[in-house]
């Protein structure tokens, strides 16, 4: 007691510690146990005295006093009466804070159904009763009666009766012989009478006996809910309420406004309606009113309670006085403004301020400039305490006055307080973790925050008016974390790709580029210098310039750490940069002895960081920055209009292209090509033209002009310097300034045929200007959409991956995934080395030539390993991956590999899921929103041939070729690949060559670099004859299956296959046959006839009775009809892949290996089946008629081959080829989108997300576990259930992984808190309550919501220590219990002391 008295002013009772949270349905007794009294009146407060009405919604007797320790009538005041209940007004004398905690209840005169269990789909009550929602609503809203007890009558149990039928039945069978009820009471009776065990047993039998496919699914759903009620201890009748809880009054306050009006929470209105209707109903029942009136009142009560719980879920939305919908209890939780997202996950922070940022070039990397005014305000409490400690002030009031007057001693103290106290700077939008970093404040005059220029790229900040917020970490722990983890000097590398993010940009790059230029014939060329002092002296004397070619001595250190000096051919400018380079054996002068573009500077910083560590790199970066700024200012680079050089050849090129387009027009008029092909070719020609103009311009700008007399090189073009160095501007922008603007897009996304020939220097014509406005406006609209979409993608990614935390060092998994270099059209897009860097080898990596082990199994692959892997010519490496990691909750460090932001193995407790989500989401705003509608030209035309990038010998895989009548080698195989090998047989490149291409090389040829391997027509796809013979037409009849179109303008005829889906006559299957001399169809060597089915739109390129050779085309399919599919690009594509949506024209993939057979057509679909070679069951596909199937009857396909082209659906890849192939597909497809924009993201981030998309397993055979066949269960639950089964020697379940989209996966996490705060709050909570779910609070989000330390980072260590401590406590208690059992209970003095 005595402690309680002392503790009044600081009642810090520790919150009860808990490890998990359970959610269930509240029973009527539970609601009554929470309540402090029943609310009988709808009144709130007395409007004269402002005191709460007794028994009303704010009643002080039920909820507690309004003022601390004072009863309502004022008889008892002050502390000494604590705990007394006043006999006059009935109010307990206690803290007014209890009005935030105490609940009341309303006793309902008639039970009502809880709307969440009724209307939240699937309706829980409906599922349990096996009734439709419509029937349920008819009973609940008093339209139909339901038979509860049929008695001896011929009515059935649970039969619905309308009013008339009910009266008729009463007349027929007598009122007492059966019971029928209406409303929630009826449903409650039925629910109460359910025997769940019997229903569950019956359902299991029914599922086992079901024959159709849909029935067991439906029954399984119902069985699941029955089992949920059995296991959770919820009773079905609790879904019908007899008492409504009333939340504490201070959570739905009534606030007096000036002018005698009140602002009130909507909940009070909703409660008032419930109470009014309930009281009216009670009165009507007492008065024995007619049935119909009571029924109406009950219905109104049901509606009032519905509105209170979830307004608008059923019927009209109930609005307040101002026509605004009232916010019900459900709305309080939902959405961005709901409790979860507004108050629990995102809170406003005190001790923070914001201001505009300006550049602070003289700051060190770890500093920021903080305005004195801001610092004084932010650090006030620290200043007060320091003033007090130093004796400047005796009270806080005095200290406040001193600070307000800004006395000199206050500034001195501010300096002390701020020393070594980091502050955090944040720039919105915070897209990744580098959006908040810690700095040491430096006090400055003025009102703007100064920011170090090198951290701008991390914040994505510029100084055109951006604002930033400052936050002060208060506790020692927070300061420690800010200094150790968040200091800008600790965040040199980008977490997404491990490259430096503290990279000079703009002026600094320009300055360093200018320094590192070397020119011919400058004064003093060829002089030798011993050290920097001599060079500076010569520069000042103007004996040499910064760009002179000189020979200078550079002093470095060798591997033993001894200094050495070496003479390099270099320039004074480069020596200046070299002077700043830290001395290290691995860092030679060659790092700086080159032209310093932005990329080279980045590589240089990377090298310094890798070899010399963090401290050296930070110092180096600061010095490089100073040097860059100084030299950019000294160089005085600017540009005028004459620097934009329009190439002389431009008009020749334009004329040439105009002639080409005229020719295409003519070809179209002659009927040689279709409208679509003409469009493709024209667009293509102009595209090439504008590229060539740009090339010419770049040539002219970059070429070095020399002074004819002295031979000295002239000043390099300034624009070229800016663009080439990477400081500002890109070739694409220069092309628009001085080349030609090129093709523009219509608002619909198609490309306009006539390009913009002018550039900005020449100026646009009116027509051109108008044409270019579409694109400009679309760009602006896109940007706005993009930001929102990108943010939403990031949110979904974070939500799906937030539980992926490093929880153990090594899971010991034997599995892994195979990595190869990614080669696209013969170009190496991502080398093998770059993909395996920083990952763990799953097997020994062996050098093929010598058999030496380069990297032993289980070792992380570092930079020096990568160099050896590159040299050794290894093609494939098996590495550990998070996809195959066997850790239960979270991921293990070995499978994850290197922490990219630190360059070291990843730490325990690192939240890799969130990092992955941020790395993928942050560049989202740079991706386009564009969906390309391309007739194939712009993407295909450049790929009408393939060249070799290497010298070597040609090997051809799957060589199936034929010589056509023109004598060319034509590719007849679908999967032919030309492999180029070295003399020693190492594969250099693999080039896939498409069907119908003409091969320019053959097996065993030697090939030079740049030599063509194959060519093909990019605009059409041929159908080739495989045998020599004579052409015959089948089912090709003029007018129905084929049209002979004569072009009006040219009079040339061509035959096009048309869709013969007419109701009349037999079904036609147009085809071309190849017959022998004997007039019979030739048999193909692989079985089947030489019959070529023709797809719609195919153009026939042969005449009947024409003689063909193998490899000749019988028809061609225009590419536009095969290719005008929208190529979804950019952000929508990434979202589509992560959401695992089926693409519109999904490819059809062979599920088994076997032989193709065509069956009877079905309506407008073609039937195709694959017969397996081993004689198993055939697999059948129905394919829409318009689709081109490039397989003939009798072709042999491998499992996983494409039958119909298109984008494959990820689910199919998973089902047919397995997890590793799926991951490879998703990683490649997503990377492709980012690569186009030049964004680098490490594969492991995408793998982390994919791992979380594969959390569920679908049960194939439940064995002897509790699962149902076809049920989706969590992977961990699946493993645990099988382990349990194995222990009990039962048959385990089998299943296969299921791919879920990120939204779906987030909603199905094991934590209902995390799911509810993401989306569809009502549905998630309803489901969790029915199942009586327990949230173990393992993820990040749940812990933020309940206000605990998150189990990642520092929190992970704390959690680990807590578990160890708990186990120790248990041990001590257990041993003590054991000892006490053997000893008589006599309390000795030692025990008492304890």
Swiss-Prot record:
The keyword Magnesium applies. One of its GO terms (molecular function) is magnesium ion binding. Disulfide bonds: none annotated. Pfam families: RNA_pol_Rpb1_1, RNA_pol_Rpb1_2, RNA_pol_Rpb1_3, RNA_pol_Rpb1_4, RNA_pol_Rpb1_5. Its EC number is 2.7.7.6. Its cofactor is Mg(2+); Zn(2+). It catalyses: RNA(n) + a ribonucleoside 5'-triphosphate = RNA(n+1) + diphosphate. Transmembrane segments: none annotated. Zn(2+) 2 binds at residues 811, 885, 892, 895. The keyword Secreted does not apply. GO terms for biological process: DNA-templated transcription. SUPFAM superfamilies: beta and beta-prime subunits of DNA dependent RNA-polymerase (SSF64484). Keywords: DNA-directed RNA polymerase, Magnesium, Metal-binding, Nucleotidyltransferase, Transcription, Transferase, Zinc. Binds 1 Mg(2+) ion per subunit. Mg(2+) binds at residues 462, 464, 466. Zn(2+) 1 binds at residues 71, 73, 86, 89. One of its GO terms (cellular component) is DNA-directed RNA polymerase complex. The RNAP catalytic core consists of 2 alpha, 1 beta, 1 beta' and 1 omega subunit. When a sigma factor is associated with the core the holoenzyme is formed, which can initiate transcription. DNA-dependent RNA polymerase catalyzes the transcription of DNA into RNA using the four ribonucleoside triphosphates as substrates. Belongs to the RNA polymerase beta' chain family. This is DNA-directed RNA polymerase subunit beta'. It comes from Xanthobacter autotrophicus (strain ATCC BAA-1158 / Py2). The gene is rpoC.
